[in-house]
Amino acid sequence: MSNTGTTGRVPLWFVGMIVGLAALGLLGIFFYGSYTGLGSSL
């Protein structure tokens, strides 16, 4: 894997993927908690 212009740095698509997965994970945990009653107090 050779990404041009991203030597010594993390590729932008990789950062975007990690941020996207983290956001989806947090939303999933929040909605799951609200449905099960754990996050209803938030």
From Swiss-Prot:
The chain crosses the membrane at residues 12-32. GO terms for cellular component: chloroplast thylakoid membrane; photosystem II reaction center. It is found in: Plastid, Chloroplast thylakoid membrane. It is a single-pass membrane protein. Keywords: Chloroplast, Membrane, Photosynthesis, Photosystem II, Plastid, Reaction center, Thylakoid, Transmembrane, Transmembrane helix. One of its GO terms (biological process) is photosynthesis. SUPFAM superfamilies: Photosystem II reaction center protein J, PsbJ. Its main location: plastid. PANTHER family: PHOTOSYSTEM II REACTION CENTER PROTEIN J (PTHR34812:SF3). HAMAP family: PSII_PsbJ. One of the components of the core complex of photosystem II (PSII). PSII is a light-driven water:plastoquinone oxidoreductase that uses light energy to abstract electrons from H(2)O, generating O(2) and a proton gradient subsequently used for ATP formation. It consists of a core antenna complex that captures photons, and an electron transfer chain that converts photonic excitation into a charge separation. Belongs to the PsbJ family. PSII is composed of 1 copy each of membrane proteins PsbA, PsbB, PsbC, PsbD, PsbE, PsbF, PsbH, PsbI, PsbJ, PsbK, PsbL, PsbM, PsbT, PsbX, PsbY, PsbZ, Psb30/Ycf12, at least 3 peripheral proteins of the oxygen-evolving complex and a large number of cofactors. It forms dimeric complexes. This is Photosystem II reaction center protein J. The gene is psbJ.
